[in-house]
Amino acid sequence: MKGRHGEEGPIRRWAGGPAGDETILLDMHVHSTCSRDSLIPVKVILKTWETLGILSVICDHNTTHGSELLAREMHIRGSDIPVIIAEEILTLQGEIIGLFLSEEIPPYLTAAETLDRIHDQGALSLVPHPFCTFRTTSLGRSGLDRLNGRIDLVEGYNSRVLREHENLLARAYAMEKGKPITAGSDAHTKAELGQTWLAVPPFGSPREFLRSLPEARVYFRPAGLEARPVAPW
């Protein structure tokens, strides 16, 4: 395997996943105890992967430490599936997630500078919960419009978004602008793990992951409800 992005080397394949055939199951938004507001140790996140086959993308607040710990533990266990090193970064305009990072990005930069730093690493940018009104850290429509040409992905399903229409607005925006969508539980407690995930074809790099998303299936459960397959849009 080459670096963190897995440009070389085999990818772990999941036979008989919910998308059929060989898929990788990814919960694209999970917080570990490396985020001060989360109660989930990395070892519990690892156990979810071992028991359910759902690999969490740990997006801790302003640090990559949680996803680095997960990558280390999976390496110790002999896994060759590439772990996505990620961080949910608080910018001056709102939160942005960097995926496939090789270096941690500091908070409190402008959104534009944060996006530059993400892309300078060959990484991908994801806007989480963009229309969620109970958070003060969502970018909103105006922020999305200003940054549209520099955004790679939009979070279309977030289990912690309480108003269903706000997830729908995110998916509608992504479709309007031609952006792939992701899905995540935004888990901060153990009970939330495994609520929402993507079933994607195997990938070995950020660009391969990006290209795999149109083929992904989404399994979504709002907090407290049963997971169910949904149409991407």
Predicted features and spans:
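Short, conserved beta-strand segments within well-ordered enzyme catalytic domains
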Residues: 27, 56-58, 82-84
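Conserved beta-strand positions
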Residues: 58-61, 127, 156-159
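Charged catalytic cores and adjacent phosphate/nucleic-acid-binding surfaces used
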Residues: 1-38, 42-47, 52, 68-71, ...
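Short beta-strand/loop segments at the ligand-binding rim of alpha/beta enzyme cores
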Residues: 120-130
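Ser/Thr-glycine-rich phosphate-binding loops at phosphate-binding pockets of nucleotides
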Residues: 32-33, 56-63
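Active-site substrate-binding loop(s) of clan PA
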Residues: 107-108, 120
